[in-house]
């Protein structure tokens, strides 16, 4: 990376030349002595080296977690909450450094990491600090002499496998509730974006007892599979594509442990004709909602990658929507004016370009974009794709398969019934958007769409206290909200008799 570009943001280079695994509160070289280069999508060039871990490293991390789990589970909820709040404070104090680290690792614009990813991470830690302080058990009076007590107890040691699209935020989504609930964690980041979590551990590691959080890097089959299939974890949480999620579920089933899976999506974004009833702030907001397919370079599981426009307004709406897309500024991710950055990897770049080619072969009309964006200078080797809009129909593969890039496929509908049918004609059910000035219609559509989250007159908001998760092949379980504590705890029932008298059966 160009150090001058980083310095302009008021921070030094967040990365060292080489990292180790973070195990038991210390930096530990991989047992096999192997490393791999991590490449920044900004230029397509390596910027650091991280461990290529294997079974021995997974075992070492599990050893450290098990050594810490009893003491951490006994730590009072007050102290755990205080630690989570201190983590939030430390992240906030180093927000710019971590935002730059995330942009270098993932390729997303620094304006997003600064304004969204890292502030959300801060808020999630604070939210779960509050949740665990407020959590209560239960008492049931069976009769005058018999009481049932219900306690929330941690699962113990949990495995977490993090995706490459939001490396720090998705790690936070899993770490915050797991730690609040009293669990120890072994976490494996995606091999495409392995480095920003290591910078985070440099920043917050001293706030946690050794072994409570352990980070091992490596590839899926070499490190992820041994972790997910280990009989020494009590749960596995995974965010990623649906095909890998099936494998994670199979691994977990061998040990009969619970899973949380947040998987793929093909989210509909539905615009009813009344959005054009006036050319006002609401319509402007709806146009932004259409353009949200390009947020994070389209690398979002809930990317609104299917746009459904009521046919009575299609031409007028699309004229304005395409102008909005054309105004999206693509450029250097460390430029604070950049609105869309680079795809996370060369592999993902090629996948997106192959789907763009497929769309044309299927007969879809490319309305804008539709190609790689080759930028100047050092950025020429980066992984950039122009925001792309296709027009077609819902049976096309570009409407049915997850592309995970800045590509939206647009079609029309006649009425509410057809809109709902098209929206639900998918294997997935993670997110959806509904845009209308009619509150009753918004409610009907929200209840009728088969998705875990339906944004209504908004899109891509991810507050800590709103449950997130999928229907159908988009996953199992929920993330965020206080209900997430239930995913990382088990219930202990003490059924106590205070009567001195025998039951009288024997």
UniProtKB/Swiss-Prot annotation:
UniProt-listed CDD domains: ALDH_ACDHII-AcoD
Main enzyme class: oxidoreductase
InterPro entries: Ald_DH/histidinol_DH, Ald_DH_C, Ald_DH_CS_CYS, Ald_DH_CS_GLU, Ald_DH_N, Aldehyde_DH_dom
Active site (catalytic residues): 262, 301
Pfam families, alphabetized: Aldedh (PF00171)
One Gene Ontology term of the molecular function aspect: aldehyde dehydrogenase (NAD+) activity
Family: Belongs to the aldehyde dehydrogenase family.
Protein's name according to its UniProt entry: Acetaldehyde dehydrogenase 2
Organism, scientific name: Cupriavidus necator (strain ATCC 17699 / DSM 428 / KCTC 22496 / NCIMB 10442 / H16 / Stanier 337) (Ralstonia eutropha)
Biological classification of the source: Bacteria, Pseudomonadati, Pseudomonadota, Betaproteobacteria, Burkholderiales
């Amino acid at each position: 990376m160009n150090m001058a570009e980083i310095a302009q943001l008021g921070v030094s280079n967040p990365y060292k030349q080489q990292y180790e695994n973070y195990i038991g509160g210390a930096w530990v070289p991989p047992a096999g002595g192997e490393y791999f280069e991590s490449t920044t999508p900004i230029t397509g060039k390596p910027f650091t080296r991280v461990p290529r871990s294997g079974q021995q490293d997974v075992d070492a991390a599990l050893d450290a977690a098990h050594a810490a789990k009893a003491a951490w589970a006994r730590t009072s909820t007050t102290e755990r909450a205080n630690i989570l709040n201190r983590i939030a404070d430390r992240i906030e104090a180093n927000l710019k450094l971590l935002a730059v680290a995330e942009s270098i690792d993932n390729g997303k614009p620094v304006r997003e990491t600064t304004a969204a990813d890292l502030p959300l991470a801060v808020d999630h830690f604070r939210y779960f600090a509050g949740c665990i302080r407020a959590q209560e058990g239960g008492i049931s009076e069976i009769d005058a002499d018999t009481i049932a007590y219900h306690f929330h107890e941690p699962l113990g040691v949990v495995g977490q496998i993090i995706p490459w699209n939001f490396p720090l935020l998705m790690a936070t989504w899993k770490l915050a509730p797991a730690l609040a609930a009293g669990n120890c964690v072994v976490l494996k980041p995606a091999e495409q974006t392995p480095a920003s979590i290591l910078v985070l551990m440099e920043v917050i590691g001293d706030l946690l007892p050794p072994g409570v959080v352990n980070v091992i890097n490596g590839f899926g089959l070499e490190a992820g599979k041994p972790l997910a299939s280990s009989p020494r974890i009590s749960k596995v949480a995974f965010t990623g594509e649906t095909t890998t999620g099936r494998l994670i579920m199979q691994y977990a089933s061998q040990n009969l442990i619970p899973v949380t899976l947040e998987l793929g999506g093909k989210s509909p974004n539905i615009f009813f004709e009344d959005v054009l009833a006036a050319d006002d702030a609401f319509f402007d907001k709806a146009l932004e909602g259409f353009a949200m397919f390009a947020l994070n370079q389209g690398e979002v599981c809930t990317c609104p990658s299917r746009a459904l426009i009521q046919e009575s307004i299609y031409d007028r709406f699309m004229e304005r929507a395409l102008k909005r897309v054309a105004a999206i500024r693509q450029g250097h991710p460390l430029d604070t004016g950049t609105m869309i950055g680079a795809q996370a990897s060369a592999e993902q770049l090629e996948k997106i370009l192959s789907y763009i080619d497929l769309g044309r072969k299927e007969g879809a009309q490319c309305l804008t974009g539709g190609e790689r964006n080759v930028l100047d200078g050092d950025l020429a080797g980066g992984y950039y794709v122009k925001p792309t809009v296709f027009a077609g129909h819902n049976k096309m593969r570009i409407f049915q398969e997850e592309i995970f890039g800045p590509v939206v496929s647009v079609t029309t509908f006649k009425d509410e019934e057809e809109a709902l049918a098209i929206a639900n004609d998918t294997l997935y059910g993670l997110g959806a958007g509904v845009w209308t000035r009619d509150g009753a219609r918004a409610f009907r559509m929200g209840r009728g769409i088969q998705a875990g989250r339906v944004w209504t007159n908004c899109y891509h908001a991810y507050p800590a206290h709103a449950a997130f998760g999928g229907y159908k092949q988009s996953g199992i379980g929920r993330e965020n909200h206080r209900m997430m504590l239930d995913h990382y705890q088990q219930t202990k029932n003490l059924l106590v008799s205070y009567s001195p008298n025998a039951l009288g059966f024997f």
